[in-house]
Amino acid sequence: MQGFFVTGTDTDVGKTVVSAWLLSHLDACYWKPVQAGTEPETDSITVRRLAEVAEDRILPEAYILPDPLSPHEAAKRAGIAIDMNRLKAPACDRPLIVEGAGGLMVPLNDNAFVIDLAA
């Protein structure tokens, strides 16, 4: 499967906007494996709105965590642990745009980082 992993060094640096642009210009699918923070809307909703694509091009998140924090901290506050086995790329018959959460070295749990999703 061909794809792109979109990352950035912080929140609000443009990962979601870049993901939406790639999605629309590459006729791709989009996946945000871990969504931390849901206000005012999730990144998946924003990407779909910006890219103006059908809902089936937006693949469901493995985790949606309410607090806008690093994934490992948001998961702790939600009382769960992020299981890397749930973070396998879903099937898609198009290129896949995967949007990370923060930079590559942001922890997902006690043993894994965002870079592990990109590998």
Predicted regions and their residues:
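N-terminal phosphate/diphosphate-binding loop that engages ATP/GTP or pyrophosphate donors
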Residues: G3, D12, V17-A81, R86-P90
